[in-house]
Amino acid sequence: MATRSLFHSLRCRLTNNGVLGSNFIRNAESSRFSKSYNADAAIGNSLVEESEEKDDLKSRIFRLRLPKRSATTVLEKWIGEGNQMTINELREISKELRRTRRYKHALEVTEWMVQHEESKISDADYASRIDLISKVFGIDAAERYFEGLDIDSKTAETYTSLLHAYAASKQTERAEALFKRIIESDSLTFGAITYNEMMTLYMSVGQVEKVPEVIEVLKQKKVSPDIFTYNLWLSSCAATFNIDELRKILEEMRHDASSNEGWVRYIDLTSIYINSSRVTNAESTLPVEAEKSISQREWITYDFLMILHTGLGNKVMIDQIWKSLRNTNQILSSRSYICVLSSYLMLGHLREAEEIIHQWKESKTTEFDASACLRILNAFRDVGLEGIASGFHLILVHNKCSLENEGSS
């Protein structure tokens, strides 16, 4: 189960950092997934340091530090001193607490909001509470809270939040039962994020064959897929070596009305990865390796996480994923080197790309493949990215990589 846990921990970074995991995804185009776990910790430390110089409400709450101390007590004292607070201020404090993993204090702030500002509580506020309850008290408590909401509060956002909680805890049967309720609902409208949660769950538990079923329902419901939807769909095809279907999906993406610069970058990089890695349909006959090791199929799903973040222009997450993969006890595949190398090149980070070349050459377990580098070079040229290809060519020359048969690789 170690490999699936690794995949789940990496995938959760896509979905765990917003109000439901869903608001974060909705806002990802602007935020570019700029907050990683280490960045969140740094934010928390800076807020604590800042709080020692200020005496506003947020500073008092962040000075609590220990989870056993009560944010409710701080709020009551603040009001008792004759101070005021707005619900938007409380939302912002709760958001900051979530970002720094202060879930208990964040939950206490939302509880105050419900008790004192119930008329102003939004669907997103209830969704946030479901997510926080699941983190603080467990999935059963989150489920009870959701079922106890009145009918008007059981919205697309709260349904999706509970589905996210099920997915995060790998509660497949519960998630499937809830998803059935969701797709049978006639009164609520769900977006791509809800379907993405279900596909993320299937990917994390190794049931990749169920991803196309979710896509089929999404299309029946006439829900527009987003780049995360496509990434999950493509990942499932690559993981099962269904490369013909993968190419069809890429073509569909090219003609999607939502296509933008990030999508084009994603499409180009996927094509480069498939061509330079030489992934073929024939590999679907390969046996899956023992559970204790990472199979080729699982490596490919990790690679597609990196491809997604490249499409979003988020170097921080590429760094984070690559570091996580290097820190495992598994032997890195040549495909993984090809993927991270292509990702850095696509975003114009030549210094990092050259560092990957050095790591690959110095690896004691994965032999450096100069011919793969030439395939990357030619693949960038094939999609019309001659400038990137030229920069990579210089890196190869500088590092004395063989360029024999360059035109035919």
UniProtKB/Swiss-Prot annotation:
GO terms for cellular component: mitochondrion. It holds the Pfam family PPR_2. It is found in: Mitochondrion. Disulfide bonds: none annotated. Keywords: Mitochondrion, Repeat, Transit peptide. InterPro entries: Pentatricopeptide_rpt (IPR002885), TPR-like_helical_dom_sf (IPR011990). Its main location: mitochondrion. PPR repeats lie at residues 155-189, 191-225, 226-256, 262-296, 298-332, 333-367. Belongs to the PPR family. P subfamily. This is Pentatricopeptide repeat-containing protein At5g09450, mitochondrial. The lineage of its organism: Eukaryota, Viridiplantae, Streptophyta, Embryophyta, Tracheophyta.
